[in-house]
């Protein structure tokens, strides 16, 4: 319901995809109540529907007495504020052509008269998408907002619906009704809503992913094609959302609305969701990626200054239970690395990794990290306990990388802790950048979704957005650990 209101205020058409009995027509009846003296028109299309049934019958008296071809439009689409057309794809070509003009220009040619349509939104519905190669592409492209209308999924909500009485008309207070004057005034204010650079960056991220997706094998380019006209309308929809939420600029909480604007086939919806969600954290993700590469580069450059392969010295490192190095700052508790495996682990400067496993050892009350290599004990290579986790290992001077995160081995007291001073500086700079720039900016983004409400985000939109934020927060924490551990390797 909220999205249809948003579409109406933005002057856009909306398509509802879903099976019968999901209250699609009720949406149109309710939406007209938002407008003062609002009129609605609804019709169930069939292959035999004629323009007379949609736009009004031809006036026999005018045709007979004045030789004028003119329709009686009162009570039909040309006089309605909200239009609902069910089974839209069954419309005949003549109806489709008239609808295109009505949607695009908000006019209807009635004989020699050009009628300005009061239509705020055309809501179309069907349980299927338009068939390919039947000339429906132009009409399909005019529906900016595309929503999937499913049956109630929650059992609690289902029985709540069952127990409720029949839905009655809602009386909207007169001071809340949208008048024509107010609607026209809003359009001017909506156009002045600002589009910040961070919004442009998020959309650029989506556009880049759309292009990459369309280049994949066995993918129809048109499945991910979005015209410039459609992008222009998307931004106008976001501006409308910001305006109705009382803002003077679009913010990141408006971006998830694009999920309902960018898919062309139902099969592409999951990919579109991923693209839109990833754009929410694109700034933080890029910063994290750059900082990670900076640390890796600094470690490699300093490592190249040392001769021979990466190694560790027992004289500098603390050995536990005769056979293990203690891994510092492992997030899940005490962690030991089997020292004999170290020489079989790939050096991180090669860009390669060695397979390994992490598993709990109840006797040692610690997590054990082992490398898997030819000649390793059979028991470790085939360990399949539920608590065994497969990891990727790389060695570095004085420590080990586990799934890309460096961990230092515990050193004996008095051991040299400044092997690579410039790396320490790089790690310190990274930590400062994370704490002073990346983290605060991310917290502001997170606050938008957790502590401010966007009227038009569905529960699913919000859930997907928060999931993306959680993934980014996890990457941010991993980056902190990587930077902190890089310091401990020194």
Where are these regions (language model features)?
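Conserved C-terminal "switch" segment of AAA+ ATPases
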Residues: 1, 147-219, 247-248
């Amino acid at each position: 319901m909220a999205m249809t209101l948003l579409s109406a205020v933005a002057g856009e058409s909306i398509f509802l995809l879903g099976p019968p009995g999901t209250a699609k027509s009720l949406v149109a009846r309710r939406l007209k109540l938002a407008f003062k003296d609002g009129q609605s028109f609804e019709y169930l299309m069939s292959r035999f529907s004629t323009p007379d049934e949609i736009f009004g019958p031809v006036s026999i008296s005018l045709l007979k007495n004045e030789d004028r071809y003119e329709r009686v439009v009162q009570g039909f689409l040309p006089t309605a504020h909200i239009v609902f057309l069910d089974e839209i794809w069954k419309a005949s070509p003549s109806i489709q052509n008239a609808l295109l003009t009505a949607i695009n220009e908000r006019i209807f040619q009635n004989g020699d008269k050009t009628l300005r349509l009061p239509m705020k939104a055309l809501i179309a519905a069907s349980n299927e998408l338009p068939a390919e190669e039947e000339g429906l592409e132009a009409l399909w492209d005019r529906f900016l907002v595309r929503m999937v209308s499913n049956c109630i999924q929650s059992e609690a909500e289902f029985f709540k619906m069952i127990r409720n009485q029949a839905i009655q008309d809602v009386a909207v207070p007169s001071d809340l009704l949208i008048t024509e004057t107010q609607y026209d005034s809003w359009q001017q204010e909506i156009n002045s809503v600002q589009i910040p650079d961070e919004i442009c960056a998020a959309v650029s991220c989506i556009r880049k992913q759309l292009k990459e997706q369309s280049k994949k094998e066995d993918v129809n380019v048109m499945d991910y094609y979005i015209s410039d006209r459609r992008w222009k309308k998307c931004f106008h929809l976001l501006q409308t959302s910001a305006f109705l939420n009382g803002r003077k600029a679009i913010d990141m909480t408006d971006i998830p609305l694009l999920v309902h604007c960018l898919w062309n086939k139902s099969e592409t919806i999951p990919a579109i969701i991923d693209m839109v969600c990833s754009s929410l954290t694109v700034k933080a993700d890029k910063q994290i990626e750059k900082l990670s590469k900076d640390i890796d580069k600094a470690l490699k450059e300093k490592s190249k200054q040392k001769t021979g392969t990466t190694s560790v010295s027992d004289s500098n490192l603390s050995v536990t239970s005769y056979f293990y190095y203690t891994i510092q700052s492992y997030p899940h508790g005490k962690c030991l690395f089997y020292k004999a495996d170290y020489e079989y682990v790939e050096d991180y400067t090669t860009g390669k990794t060695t397979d390994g496993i992490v598993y709990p050892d109840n006797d040692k009350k610690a997590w054990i990290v082992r490398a898997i290599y030819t000649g390793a004990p059979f028991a470790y290579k085939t360990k399949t306990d539920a608590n065994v986790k497969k990891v990727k290992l790389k060695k570095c001077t004085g420590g080990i990388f586990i799934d890309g995160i460096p961990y230092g081995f515990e050193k004996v007291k008095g051991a040299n802790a400044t092997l690579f001073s410039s790396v320490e500086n790089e790690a310190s700079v990274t930590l400062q950048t994370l704490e002073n720039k990346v983290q605060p900016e991310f917290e502001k983004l997170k606050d938008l979704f957790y502590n401010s409400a966007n009227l038009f985000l569905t529960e699913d939109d919000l859930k997907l957005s928060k999931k993306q934020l959680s993934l980014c927060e996890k990457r941010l924490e991993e980056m902190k650990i990587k930077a902190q551990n890089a310091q401990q390797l020194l």
